Amino acid sequence: MIIPVLNYYSCTRSNYMNEVDDNGNEIHGEYDNSKVKIIFFGQGNKIIFKEKIKTKKLDIVCDGNNIYIEIGKSCIINGHIRISSDCKLIIGDNLLSQFSNGYYIGEGCSMTIGNDCMFSGGITFRTDDSHAIYDVITGNRINKGKDIIIGNHVWVCENCKN
């Protein structure tokens, strides 16, 4: 069975934006080049670039409703962000993430990255496993999603997986 995507919006512009689409999805801010791809599969989502970001390639997929993303000042970020309904991603100022990394936020969780952080490459951040695991005896779910909080001045090494 194929389910059509009703609320699809893609943006690849390279200038200042202050846009709201027909589904209430908002993009505010500026980035360096046309290598940022933003896709909405939902409504009522908001992305804020507080200041011009630099990137070689950044894909942002908002896969649901009521998503909030805020990227701070003077950030260099590359990779893939996939975020689900009712989730939040807050990136502080001066993030240096020159290589491709993955940020996957689901199950109503949030990820917060402090100021002045540096990330190497091949890093995957996940708030959840994106599938349920149940205890065979109790039948209770044992892998519920949790928030990720990274403080200020944190270095994350190459190929680190959360």
Segments (PLM) and residue ranges:
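Terminal amphipathic alpha-helical/low-complexity segments used for targeting or macromolecular assembly
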Residues: M1-T55, D116, D129-Y134, H153
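Flexible, glycine/small-residue-enriched loop-and-beta-strand segment within the central core
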Residues: K46-N162
